C-alpha cells in the first residue's frame, strides 16, 4: 500500500511539473526521493541547488529515520507516503515511556509528549547528523530571505513555498495569479463557507480564515434571531393589536348613530384591521359587509402583483406596489413567517394620504381610539421599540405622531371627526413634520406627498443613496438603476468610487450626486441602530486599521476589491434580513485516536484587527438591544456568547500576526477546526424548536445554502423606458488561495469567500425568493458577478484538489 502511495505521489509531482511548463512562474518541484532516505543520506551532499521545501525535508530526514512523529503536518504527511516511516513512528511510540516525567501545570499534552521524548533521549542525533541538520538550517535561513524576491510585476517568490505538494495538481494559471497578487479566488459552488474549512481540516490544508466567514455567521445570527422573535413573540403581538383595534373601530361604527361621517370612517378602519387580522391569521374577523370589503385587498395581497385599489384613495388611478407583499428573505421558511410578513407589510405600507381629508380623518379616528386601547398600544410599543433599535426610525408619518397631534385638540372625538378646521390643523402639522422627516420618496410623485402608516417602514441611509444616484432629469434616463457600489462610495470607500468613475457613465450629474451623498453620509449617526452599526462595520473592514503592519497581499488594489466583494455581499445579506422593515426606494410610485500527538497544521487569520474589534462591538450592541427589549432567550444568549468567543479569538490571532508574535500550537489547533466550530453554531441557529440536527446535511430548504437575494430598488421612473427591479444577492461560496508568511516560511493556505452578485429583472416579473434564486444558480452559476471582480478570479476547468495521498486527518 505504501509503495502504491509513493508511486501516486511521484505521479502527482510529475503532473505538477507538467502543468508548469508553459508558465513563467512555478512552484518548486522536488528533487529528492524521500523513499530512499531511510538507508542513504549523503551528509556531504551539495545543497546549494535545492529549493526551500526540499531543504526542509532533508533537514528532518535524520529524525524521520528514528520514527519521530513530526509536529509539522506537512513534513509528517510527506514522510507518511513512504513504506517505512509510519512503522517507525509506532516503534517510537512504544519506546515513549514517560512514567518518570511529570507533566507541568497547564502543559498541553502535545508539548509534554515532545519534551518528555527529548528528556528520555528518544531524539538524540550523532555529531554527523547534527552537523548535517545545522548546515541545512543555515541554508534554509538564507533561502527565506528571498521570500519576496520575485520577478518584475510579481509580489511573492513561489519557489519558496514550503508546502508545494499540498495540492494534487498545481495549475499554472493559479500559480501565476498567486505570484502576481499573493492570492487568487477560484469560482466554486460550495453550499456554505464552513464546508471549505472542514475539507481543509480533513486534508490538513492550512486554513486562511476570512472576514467573510464571520460576516456570514453574523448574518445568520441576525436572520435567525429575527425569525425566533417574530414567530414566537411579534406575530402574536400583532394579531392581538389588529384584533383589539378592529374591535375598537367596530364599536365606533356601532356607536356612530346618525353620524354618517363617523360611521363610514369607522367602517373603513374596521376593514383595514380586518385585512390585517386576516393576513396575520388566515381568518376574517369582521362582519359580512366588512369581510366583503376586505376580500379584494386580501386577494391582491396574496396575488402580489401591482394593481389599482378602491380601498386607498391615492391608488384609484395609480398602481399600488402589491408585488412587495410577496414573502421574501427568511419569511418563506414557514407559514407563520409568511403570514407575519404579509400582515406587517400591510400595517407598514398601506398609507393614509394627507392630501385626502377622508384619509386624514381615518388616521385621526385610529389615533383617538388607540389612546384608550392600553393593551393594544403596549403591544404596538413593544414591537415598535425593537424594530426602531434594530432597523431604524420610521420614514413615513407614524400612528404615534398622529396621536401627538390629536392630544393637542380639546374636542371630543365625535366633534373632532367632523371639524374640518381642526382636521386641517392636524393635517398641516403632520405635513410639516413629514416634509422634514420623510427622505425616501419617488422622484415622480403621483400620490400624497406625505403619508401616514400605522407602523411605517424604516429609513436606512443606503436607500437614500440608491434613490439619489439615478438620473431623473434626462429623457430617456442616462442612469436608470443605481449600484451597490454607490452606497459604499458615498460612505467614503475610495476603491468603490474609483471603480464607479472608471466605468462608462453618460450621466453628467453623477459626480454632483455622489458628492451630495458623501456629505449626507457624514450626517448619519452610525451607532443609532443595529443595521447602521452593521453598515459601519463593513466600512471599517475597508479602512484597514494598522495598514503599515498588514501582510503584503492586503495592501494592494486587488485586495481592496476582495474587501469590496465581502462588504457588498454582507450588505446584500443585511438587505435580505431587513427586507420587511426597511423602506425600499423607487423611481416612481470523526476518526480514531492515536498514541502520538496529532501534527500541527499552521493556519492564518485575515489580520484586519479594526474589523474584528468592530465586529465584537456590533455583536455586543445587538445583544444589548435584545436584552433591553426582553427578547433575548437563553438559547440566543448562549449562541451570542459562542460567536463572541470566536470573534475575540480571531482578533487575538490577528493582533499576534500583525505584531509578529508567536502563535501557540493550541491556537493553531483552534484555527484548524474553525469550520466545524462555525458549522455547529450555524446548526444551533437554524434548528427549529425541539429539533435536533446531526449535521448540515439534515438542514432542509433554502437555509442549506449561503446563496440569497434581496430586491433593493424599483427602477420605475417616468423617464425610464426599461423599468426594472434591482437585486443584490450572494451566490455560492468561492475558494480563496493565499500565500502567507508564517514564522518566516511561505505557506499556501485556502479559505472561503462570499460571492457578491448584482442584477436586474423586468418590473412585471415577481420579486425573487431565495429558493428561486438558488434554482437560477443551478442553471447559471455565475449570474450577476460584477465585471470589476472578474480579474481576481482564476477560472479553472476543475477545482484544485487537496493531495489526499499525502495529507488527511484521522480526526473528526
Regions of interest found by a model, annotated:
Residues 1-5:
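Positively charged n-region of N-terminal signal peptides that target proteins for export
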Residues 14-17:
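C-terminal motif of bacterial Sec signal peptides marking the signal peptidase cleavage site
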Residues 19-21:
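Bacterial signal peptide processing site
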Residues 33-44, 62, 112-120, 626-633, ...:
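Acidic/histidine-rich, surface-exposed loop or edge segments in extracytoplasmic proteins
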Residues 39-43, 48-76, 80:
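Short N-proximal segments of mature Sec-exported proteins
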Residues 49-53, 120-127, 131, 142, ...:
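Surface-exposed, polar/charged faces of alpha-helical domains
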Residues 70, 78-148:
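Compact alpha-helical subdomains of small soluble proteins
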Residues 148-812:
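Long, non-catalytic protein-protein interaction scaffolds
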Amino acid at each position: 500500500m505504501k509503495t502504491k502511495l509513493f508511486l501516486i505521489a511521484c505521479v502527482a509531482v510529475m503532473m505538477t511539473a507538467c502543468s508548469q511548463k508553459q508558465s513563467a512562474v512555478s512552484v518548486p518541484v522536488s528533487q529528492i526521493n524521500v523513499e530512499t532516505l531511510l538507508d542513504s543520506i549523503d551528509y556531504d551532499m551539495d545543497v546549494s541547488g535545492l529549493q526551500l521545501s526540499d531543504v526542509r525535508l532533508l533537514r528532518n530526514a535524520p529524525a524521520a529515520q528514528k520514527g519521530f512523529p513530526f509536529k509539522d503536518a506537512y513534513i509528517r504527511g510527506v514522510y507518511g507516503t513512504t513504506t517505512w516511516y509510519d512503522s517507525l513512528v509506532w516503534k517510537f511510540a512504544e519506546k515513549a515511556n514517560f512514567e518518570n516525567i511529570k507533566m507541568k501545570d497547564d502543559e498541553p499534552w502535545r508539548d509534554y509528549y515532545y519534551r518528555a521524548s527529548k528528556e528520555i533521549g528518544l531524539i538524540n542525533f550523532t555529531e554527523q547528523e547534527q552537523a548535517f541538520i545545522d548546515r541545512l538550517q543555515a541554508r534554509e535561513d538564507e533561502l527565506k530571505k528571498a521570500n519576496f524576491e520575485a520577478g518584475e510585476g510579481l509580489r511573492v517568490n513561489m519557489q519558496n513555498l514550503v508546502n508545494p505538494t499540498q495540492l494534487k495538481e498545481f495549475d499554472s494559471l493559479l500559480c501565476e495569479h498567486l505570484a502576481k497578487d499573493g492570492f487568487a479566488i477560484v469560482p466554486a459552488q460550495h453550499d456554505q463557507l464552513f464546508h471549505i474549512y472542514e475539507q481543509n481540516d480533513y486534508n490538513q490544508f492550512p486554513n486562511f480564515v476570512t472576514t467573510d466567514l464571520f460576516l456570514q455567521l453574523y448574518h445568520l445570527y441576525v436572520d435567525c434571531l429575527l425569525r425566533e422573535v417574530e414567530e414566537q413573540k411579534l406575530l402574536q403581538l400583532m394579531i392581538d393589536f389588529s384584533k383589539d383595534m378592529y374591535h375598537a373601530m367596530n364599536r365606533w361604527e356601532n356607536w356612530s348613530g346618525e353620524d354618517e361621517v363617523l360611521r363610514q370612517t369607522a367602517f373603513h378602519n374596521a376593514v383595514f384591521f380586518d385585512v390585517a387580522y386576516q393576513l396575520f391569521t388566515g381568518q376574517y374577523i369582521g362582519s359580512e359587509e366588512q369581510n366583503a370589503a376586505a376580500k379584494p385587498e386580501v386577494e391582491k395581497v396574496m396575488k402580489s402583483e401591482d394593481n389599482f385599489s378602491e380601498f386607498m384613495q391615492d391608488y384609484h388611478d395609480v398602481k399600488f406596489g402589491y408585488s412587495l407583499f410577496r414573502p421574501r428573505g427568511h419569511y418563506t421558511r414557514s407559514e407563520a413567517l409568511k403570514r407575519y410578513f404579509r400582515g406587517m407589510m400591510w400595517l407598514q405600507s398601506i398609507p393614509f394620504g394627507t392630501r385626502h381629508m377622508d384619509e386624514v380623518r381615518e388616521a385621526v379616528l385610529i389615533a383617538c381610539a388607540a389612546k384608550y386601547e392600553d393593551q393594544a398600544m403596549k403591544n404596538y410599543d413593544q414591537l415598535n421599540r425593537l424594530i426602531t433599535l434594530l432597523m431604524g426610525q420610521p420614514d413615513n408619518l407614524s400612528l404615534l405622531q398622529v396621536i401627538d397631534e390629536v392630544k393637542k385638540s380639546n374636542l371630543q372625538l365625535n366633534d373632532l371627526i367632523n371639524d374640518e378646521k381642526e382636521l386641517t390643523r392636524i393635517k398641516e402639522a403632520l405635513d410639516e413634520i413629514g416634509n422634514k422627516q420623510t427622505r425616501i420618496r419617488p422622484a415622480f410623485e403621483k400620490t400624497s406627498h406625505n403619508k401616514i402608516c400605522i407602523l411605517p417602514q424604516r429609513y436606512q441611509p443606503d436607500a437614500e443613496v440608491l434613490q439619489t444616484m439615478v438620473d431623473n432629469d434626462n429623457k430617456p434616463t442616462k442612469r436608470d438603476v443605481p449600484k451597490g457600489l454607490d452606497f459604499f462610495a458615498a460612505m467614503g470607500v475610495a476603491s468603490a468610487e474609483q471603480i464607479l468613475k472608471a466605468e462608462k457613465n453618460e450621466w453628467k450629474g453623477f459626480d454632483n450626486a455622489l458628492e451630495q451623498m458623501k456629505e449626507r453620509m457624514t450626517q448619519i449617526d452610525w451607532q443609532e441602530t443595529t443595521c447602521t452599526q452593521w453598515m459601519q462595520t463593513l466600512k471599517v473592514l475597508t479602512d484597514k486599521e494598522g495598514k503599515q503592519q498588514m501582510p503584503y497581499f492586503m495592501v494592494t488594489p486587488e485586495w481592496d476589491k476582495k474587501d469590496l466583494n465581502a462588504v457588498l455581499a454582507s450588505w446584500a445579506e443585511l438587505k435580505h434580513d431587513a427586507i420587511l422593515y426597511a423602506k425600499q426606494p423607487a423611481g416612481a410610485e470523526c476518526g480514531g485516536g492515536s498514541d502520538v500527538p496529532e501534527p500541527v497544521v499552521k493556519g492564518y487569520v485575515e489580520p484586519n484587527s479594526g474589523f474584528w474589534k468592530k465586529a465584537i462591538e456590533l455583536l455586543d450592541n445587538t445583544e444589548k438591544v435584545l436584552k433591553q427589549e426582553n427578547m433575548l432567550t437563553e438559547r440566543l444568549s448562549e449562541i451570542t456568547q459562542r460567536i463572541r468567543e470566536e470573534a475575540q479569538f480571531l482578533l487575538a490571532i490577528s493582533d499576534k500576526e500583525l505584531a509578529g508574535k508567536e502563535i501557540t500550537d493550541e491556537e493553531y489547533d483552534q484555527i484548524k477546526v474553525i469550520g466545524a466550530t462555525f458549522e455547529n453554531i450555524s446548526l444551533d441557529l437554524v434548528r427549529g424548536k425541539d429539533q435536533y440536527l446531526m449535521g448540515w446535511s439534515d438542514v432542509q430548504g433554502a437555509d442549506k445554502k449561503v446563496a440569497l437575494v434581496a430586491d433593493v430598488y424599483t427602477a420605475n421612473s417616468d423617464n425610464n423606458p426599461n423599468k426594472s427591479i434591482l437585486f443584490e444577492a450572494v451566490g455560492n461560496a468561492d475558494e480563496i488561495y493565499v500565500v502567507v508568511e508564517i514564522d518566516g516560511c511561505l505557506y499556501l493556505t485556502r479559505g472561503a469567500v462570499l460571492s457578491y452578485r448584482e442584477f436586474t429583472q423586468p418590473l412585471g416579473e415577481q420579486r425573487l425568493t431565495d429558493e428561486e434564486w438558488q434554482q437560477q444558480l443551478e442553471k447559471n452559476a455565475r449570474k450577476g458577478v460584477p465585471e470589476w471582480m472578474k480579474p481576481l478570479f482564476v477560472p479553472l476547468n476543475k477545482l484544485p484538489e487537496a493531495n489526499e495521498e499525502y495529507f488527511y486527518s484521522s480526526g473528526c
